[in-house]
Amino acid sequence: MPDEGLTPEPAEGLTPGTGADAATLALVHVPLPASDVVSGNPTTAVHPLALLGGTEVGIWEMTPGTASDTETDEVFVVLSGRARIAFDDPDLPDLDVSPGSVVRLAEGQRTVWTVTETLRKIYIA
């Protein structure tokens, strides 16, 4: 049975020896600050799973819409959805991300996220 041993709703994150289904974990969405919204009515949700030596691992999700952000040092893997990430740095091309995309962001990078299908990712930051 593939889900055996998985904790369906880890309220306080994961404890050693437990797991969760990252694709179906229920998340609580909140509206983005109006100053960050470029278009639409996007919401985001975050669910920290573990803190490992000062590095946080968790699940983040954004609904369709466009929003600006200032990034933190992070690597993430897209689980579901689609988006385009535009960078303020003219030397960096826009990134189209979809399931399986692995992306590295740096502290202080300014971005604009255009989500066309609710985007869910696992982040390490």
Where does each model-flagged region fall?
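A generic structural motif
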Residues: 86-88, 114
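A short, N-terminal "cap"/entry segment at the start of jelly-roll beta-barrel domains
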Residues: 1-58
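Short acidic-glycine-tyrosine-enriched beta hairpin
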Residues: 90-107
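Conserved short histidine dyad/triad with adjacent acidic residue
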Residues: 51-71, 107
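A short hydrophobic beta-strand segment most commonly corresponding to one strand
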Residues: 104, 117-125
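Short, charged beta-turn/beta-strand-edge "cap" motif at the junction between a beta-strand
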Residues: 109-112
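Short hydrophobic/aromatic-rich beta-strand segments that constitute the beta-sheet cores
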Residues: 69, 85, 121-124
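Short, conserved beta-strand element in jelly-roll/cupin
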Residues: 71-85
